[in-house]
Structure formats: structure tokens, C-alpha cells
């Protein structure tokens, strides 16, 4: 197992090219060379396998040898197949192993079956951001435990997940949340007994403050906006789960729709599917000009230059997102958050032009119960 070996830590930027090539090939050509339990050659492949969640690493003593082993044979999917009984010995084990989150068909639109991946099943923040936060924290865990404190700017969900993880691992956290956020975020962080700074109108305003105060106080800045541990979480879990689930269900998967906040999960999805299943189109969804949708924003420049961008980016207004989410609730009994409503709206538009039978997947980052105040203006309509 990768965790049984000692290896000099590489930052993701150093091994992401190797990881992408490994995904594209689907096989590991050379073993990892060790002396005893220490990796001495093949560090990029070692960290790639570990970041992908492979359960095995082929090793040879002293020097690398040709092995040509498939990622599947190295346990690529093992960690996302879950526990049949769903019994866990700790909350950390729950967060790591309660996989995959559900994939459910919610609508037929013309020739398209529309499936929703329900990310509110993540237990800490009730959102996809549990994945991001766990990857950010575990990627810097030695530094975090040495310094004892973490600072981070967040629109809410990442901050909630970080505050929960702080209790699991035993460090303090200060989260910077904009005044425009729904009350769920600050209240949950306070419920965890951690510090929350509520000010400004956006995370863009708060990022310099979080960085400045982290440097002043000797805290670790997680920096979900620039740390590649963010999109790596979605290569390892979100994309891999969708790949496994769509194959299990026999889907004719043509497109995956996902909203863009930090753009971390879109980058993870685009990178994974372009390498492993290039016939699947990943579509990014952002707020239309003049619209505000919690947790997502417009991007003038792709923020993850080492990873693939979505094949297309679609604009959705806040009103369209809300009305589609409420329509889905009234059809299915499931109320997506506003960002999920935006992705569903984009998928429904695309389905109108679909000429053959196909399946689309929409990633729904969180539940609409967090946004009832915002939905209230459309209720009864």
C-alpha cells in the first residue's frame, strides 16, 4: 500500500503531468524503486498513484523495472465502492469511505435521461466541499499540526467543512465568510466552536485579508483558490465515482455539467474524463452577467493551468437557476441548491438539441434547504 512506504513529499505541481499521462494510458509502465520502505526512484508515479487513490504500488528493490499494470489492478476504484453495511469506526473513516454519493435519474428531457449526483450526502458541510476540504487539509497536514491553526476564505461550504475537520484532527481554524453568504455558513462554523470573520461582499475581497493575517499569525493558509489539492480531490473521488457509477448503470454518458466557483471540481472532472473517456464532454456553468448565484462566479481566466478546462462554459441567470431548481423539487421531491439548479438548467438547454439517446450527469453541490430565503421570492410562482 502507498501509505506503507516513506517518500519525499512532492507538491502537486511536480507530479500532475505524470498523473495526467498515467490516466491517459491507464497503465503504470515502470515499478517504483525502493530501498527497504523508502522510495528512491519514481516519485512522480508514486505520488500520482497515491493521489488517484490506488490501493497498491508495485515496487522493486534498488531500481525500476517494467511492470505494465493497469490502474484497475492497482485498486483505482476500491476506495469509492464503499462499505456494504455502512458501519464506520470514526467520523474520519465515514468522510473518507462513505462512497460513492448517490447518482439518481431525475428527469427525461427529449432523448436525454438526466442524472443528478447528490453531493449533499457528504456529512460535514452537506456539500461537495467536504471532498475539497479533506484534500486541502490532508495535503498540508504535517504543516497544519506543527502550526496548530488554519485560515481560509470561503463562501461558506468549504469553511464549514474545514471547521468540522479541525475538530476531527485537532487544530484551530479561522474562516473568512462574506456578508452576502447565507446564515448557514457562519452559524455552522460557530457551532463547531471555531472563529468566523464575516465581512465584505465576496471571497475575492477576503482572500488578501486571510493571507495577510495567516502570515502575521503563523497559520497555514489552505488557499482553495490556488492549491492543486482542490482539483485533485475531484479527480480522485468525484470524477472516479461518476466513471464507476455510469459504467455500472450502463449509461450512454455524453456530458457532465458542473458549476464553477473555485472551478476545482470542474477542473478535476475535465482532466479525468478527457484522459479516461474523451467521448464525455464536461461543461462548466457560471452565473450570467449581472447574476449572483451562491458559491459560483464568472472566470475571466482559467485558474488551473496544469489541468484541463471544460469543453464549454454556459451562462445561467440566478432566476433561471432558482426556477429550474423549484421545478425539479415539484417533480421529484428533491430540492437542489441554486448552483445545482444552474447546472440542471444548462443541461436541459443542451438536451433540446440532442438528436440521439444519451445520458447527461449534473453535479449538484448541495441542498436547497440552505437557500430557502433566496428561494422564497419565487415560491408560489
Model-derived regions: residue spans:
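Helix N-cap / beta->alpha transition motif
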Residues: 1-4, 31, 117, 317
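Active-site-proximal helix-loop elements at catalytic-domain edges
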Residues: 1-22, 291-305
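Basic- and aromatic-enriched surface patches that contact anionic nucleotides/nucleic acids
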Residues: 29, 36-79
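PLP-dependent amino-acid enzyme catalytic core
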Residues: 69-381
Amino acid at each position: 500500500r502507498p501509505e506503507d512506504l516513506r517518500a519525499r513529499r512532492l507538491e502537486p505541481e511536480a507530479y500532475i503531468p505524470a498523473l495526467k499521462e498515467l490516466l491517459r494510458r491507464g497503465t503504470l509502465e515502470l515499478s517504483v524503486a525502493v530501498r527497504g520502505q523508502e522510495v528512491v526512484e519514481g516519485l512522480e508515479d508514486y505520488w500520482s498513484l497515491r493521489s488517484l487513490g490506488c490501493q497498491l504500488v508495485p515496487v522493486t528493490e534498488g531500481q525500476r523495472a517494467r511492470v505494465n499494470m493497469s490502474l484497475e489492478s492497482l485498486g483505482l476504484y476500491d476506495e469509492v465502492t464503499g462499505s456494504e453495511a455502512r458501519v464506520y469506526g470514526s467520523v474520519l473513516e465515514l468522510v473518507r469511505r462513505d462512497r460513492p454519493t448517490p447518482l439518481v435519474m431525475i428527469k427525461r428531457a427529449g432523448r436525454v435521461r438526466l442524472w443528478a449526483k447528490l453531493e449533499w450526502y457528504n456529512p460535514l458541510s452537506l456539500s461537495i466541499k467536504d471532498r475539497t476540504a479533506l484534500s486541502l487539509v490532508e495535503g498540508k497536514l504535517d504543516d497544519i499540526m506543527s502550526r496548530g491553526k488554519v485560515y481560509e476564505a470561503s463562501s461558506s461550504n468549504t469553511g464549514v467543512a474545514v471547521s468540522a475537520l479541525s475538530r476531527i484532527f485537532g487544530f484551530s481554524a479561522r474562516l473568512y465568510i462574506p456578508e452576502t453568504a447565507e446564515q448557514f455558513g457562519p452559524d455552522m462554523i460557530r457551532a463547531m466552536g471555531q472563529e468566523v470573520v464575516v465581512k465584505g461582499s465576496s471571497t475575492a475581497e477576503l482572500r488578501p485579508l486571510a493571507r495577510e493575517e495567516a502570515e502575521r499569525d503563523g497559520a497555514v493558509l489552505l488557499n482553495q483558490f490556488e492549491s492543486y489539492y482542490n482539483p485533485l480531490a475531484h479527480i480522485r473521488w468525484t470524477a472516479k465515482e461518476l466513471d464507476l457509477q455510469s459504467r455500472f448503470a450502463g449509461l450512454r454518458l455524453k456530458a457532465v455539467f458542473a458549476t464553477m466557483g473555485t472551478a476545482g471540481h470542474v477542473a478535476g472532472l475535465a482532466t479525468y474524463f478527457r484522459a479516461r473517456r474523451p467521448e464525455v464532454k464536461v461543461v462548466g456553468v457560471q452565473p450570467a452577467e449581472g447574476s449572483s448565484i451562491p458559491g459560483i462566479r464568472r472566470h475571466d481566466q482559467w485558474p488551473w493551468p496544469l489541468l484541463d478546462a471544460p469543453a464549454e462554459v454556459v451562462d445561467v441567470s440566478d432566476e433561471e437557476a432558482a426556477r429550474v431548481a423549484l421545478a425539479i423539487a415539484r417533480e421529484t421531491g428533491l430540492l437542489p441548491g441554486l448552483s445545482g439548479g444552474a447546472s440542471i438548467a444548462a443541461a436541459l438547454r443542451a438536451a433540446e438539441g440532442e438528436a440521439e439517446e444519451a445520458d447527461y450527469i449534473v453535479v449538484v453541490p448541495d441542498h436547497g434547504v440552505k437557500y430557502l430565503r433566496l428561494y422564497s421570492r419565487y415560491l408560489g410562482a
